[in-house]
Amino acid sequence: MARIGVLGLGNWGTALALVWCKDGHNVLGWTVEQEVYESVMSSQENEKYLPGYKIPGMDCTMEIADVTESCEILVLALPSSVILEVVDLLIPSLRPSHLLVDLAKGLAPSSEGGSGLISDAIERRLSDAGMSNQVVVMTGPTIAPEVARGVITNALVACHDKVVAERVAER
């Protein structure tokens, strides 16, 4: 089973990490917030963004290299305002086997050109770096606290490669 790296431990990233940990996946969360890192490491809970939910077995780091070195699936649970900056940080360490999952809502800045979709901007940056990693988009009317509570919801999972999208959609 591939290790999942969740980049961004806001309420959405944390809720998904919780679900994946409960399903037995090996999850490593990445945050730039010292407060979140300390909370997850000391109490296995993100007291800032998703209080009241223990995340059994999730590791946490503040070093992005830890994620690229030890994870195969990189979940970008980041605000649209910073996701492309983080992708730029990831690119030098990406392996061809890394799968990127884009959870960002909103559009890419107009300076990115193209369709305005964040996933297209990610793919363009990868292509400019000579890389062809698969990018999966996961979106929908999902609410993090409900997902954390186990409420059933729907999400759209899309990728140019249907098999990859189906693999991600399985959980």
Predicted regions and their residues:
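NAD(P)+-binding Rossmann beta1-loop-alpha1 motif at the extreme N-terminus of oxidoreductases
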Residues: 1-53, 59-62, 89, 110
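Nucleotide donor/acceptor-binding cores
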Residues: 2, 98, 153
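Conserved SAM-binding loop
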Residues: 29, 60, 75-76, 157
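Rossmann-like NAD(P)(H) cofactor-binding subdomain of soluble oxidoreductases
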Residues: 64, 69, 73-150, 165-169
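Glycine-rich phosphate-binding loop of ATP-grasp-fold ATP-dependent ligases
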Residues: 149-158
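Active-site-lining helix/loop region of Rossmann-like oxidoreductase modules
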Residues: 156, 162-171
